[in-house]
């Protein structure tokens, strides 16, 4: 079955809010074997919404609407669909009572326009709104399935999970879709794709979808099967083939982000970390502290943006700063070693470089050095040559820091 998601709301077209509902629904629908081929966004306008419905009916078996179920005059979704299908709108008594109870509890007047939220298409299956007022609904008519959902994600998402997905399973073949995301760092999308090109060209089930995002590459493996164990076998076979070729760049699955993986390894090995940040200005430390319980492994950091701090707090020799410069391998080495000693940590990591947009110390933007000092190990400095905006260079530098930290921790 093929679906189209139609998001209704002028605020979406104006860019005032992001259409996160479509992303959520697409992922959920794919997991139960419903293909989403189109996303449509239309404003709060009866005529244009009617046109969107007519177009969607020509190319989709299922039309899923989000938004436009509220109490105001510009909430037109139910009325427009009712007119299009020649269906009446009737009050759902449970929804009407629930909305009335809310106004009674809050001491507010239950006005006619708020009663409008309890209207549903005659004959539709009603989805209770446990986190808001307007119920959702589903109607099978003329060989098409129409699903109407509230716009606020805090209402739509739990409604989908509790009521909509069980309803939609009545229209699926029983063949589910299972996905696994492989995460890679330290290799570009084009390089990775070349190494697995024959697998991509020959893909059937599972499929392989590469995606580059903010300095890393993911491969989404997607298999269709009625049985989850068989789907897992299909995915595992292709994963094994991929990792035989590019396993050195692989670091995790799905939502296992690089900084979380590095912190997990620190905890596992019982080692502590300190950071010295010039270029990144605290970005690395900020990401470290996103992990719960990180105080057991993170001693702290020094933001050493000015050379005075590098020299007088972290004891980078004046001759290094005047001869090699702050953006240098030698400076990165001293920063990593000395922050480790200063904060009595097992590991020190440092970041120094040129974020841009202008050159500094006759070095171009994107020139970066990441230092890594680990007890009982020789200090290593990783030179980087990055591209992008000032913020992208800073963020990618921090990510490379986590990557090199993770890889070194795997070795020891």
From Swiss-Prot:
Coiled-coil parts of chain: none
A matching Pfam family: CinA_KH
Family according to the record: Belongs to the CinA family.
Record-linked NCBIfam families: cinA_nterm, molyb_syn, PncC_domain, PRK00549.1
Name by which UniProt lists this protein: Putative competence-damage inducible protein
The organism of origin for this protein: Bacillus cereus (strain ZK / E33L)
Gene name per UniProt: cinA
């Amino acid at each position: 079955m093929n679906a189209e998601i139609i998001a209704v709301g002028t605020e979406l077209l104006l860019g005032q809010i992001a259409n996160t509902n479509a992303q959520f629904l697409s992922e959920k629908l794919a997991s139960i074997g419903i293909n989403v081929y189109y996303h449509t966004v239309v404003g709060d306008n009866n005529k244009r919404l009617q046109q969107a419905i007519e177009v969607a009916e020509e190319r989709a078996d299922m039309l899923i609407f989000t938004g436009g179920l509220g109490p105001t005059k510009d909430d037109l979704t139910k009325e427009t669909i009712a007119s299009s299908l020649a269906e009446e709108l009737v009050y759902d008594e449970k929804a009407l009572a629930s909305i009335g109870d809310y106004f009674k509890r809050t001491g507010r007047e239950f006005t006619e326009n708020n009663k409008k939220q309890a209207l549903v298409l005659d004959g539709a299956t009603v989805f209770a709104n446990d986190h808001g007022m307007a119920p959702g609904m589903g109607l099978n008519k003329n060989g098409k399935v129409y699903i109407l959902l509230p716009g606020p994600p805090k209402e739509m998402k739990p409604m989908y999970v509790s009521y909509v997905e069980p309803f939609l399973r009545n229209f699926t073949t029983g063949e589910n879709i299972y996905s696994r995301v492989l995460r890679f760092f330290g290799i570009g999308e084009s390089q990775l794709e070349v190494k697995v090109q024959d697998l991509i060209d020959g893909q059937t089930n599972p499929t392989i979808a590469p995606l580059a995002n903010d300095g890393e590459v993911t491969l989404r493996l997607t298999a269709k099967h009625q049985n989850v164990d068989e789907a897992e076998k299909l995915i595992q076979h292709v994963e094994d083939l991929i990792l035989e070729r590019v396993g050195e760049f692989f670091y995790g699955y799905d939502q296992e982000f690089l900084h979380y993986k590095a912190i997990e390894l620190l905890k596992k090995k019982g080692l502590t970390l300190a950071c010295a940040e010039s270029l990144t200005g605290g970005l690395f430390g900020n990401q470290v502290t996103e992990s719960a319980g990180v105080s057991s492994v993170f001693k702290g950091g020094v933001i050493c943006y000015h050379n005075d701090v590098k020299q007088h707090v972290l004891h980078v020799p004046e001759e290094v700063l005047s001869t090699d410069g702050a953006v240098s391998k030698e400076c990165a080495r001293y920063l990593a070693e000395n922050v480790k000693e200063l904060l009595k940590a097992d590991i020190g990591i440092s970041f120094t470089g040129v974020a841009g947009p202008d050159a500094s110390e006759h070095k171009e933007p994107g020139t970066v050095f990441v230092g890594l000092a680990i007890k009982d190990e020789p200090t290593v400095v990783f030179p980087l040559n990055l591209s992008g905006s000032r913020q992208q260079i800073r963020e990618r530098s921090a990510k490379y820091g986590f990557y090199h930290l993770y890889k070194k921790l795997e070795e020891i």
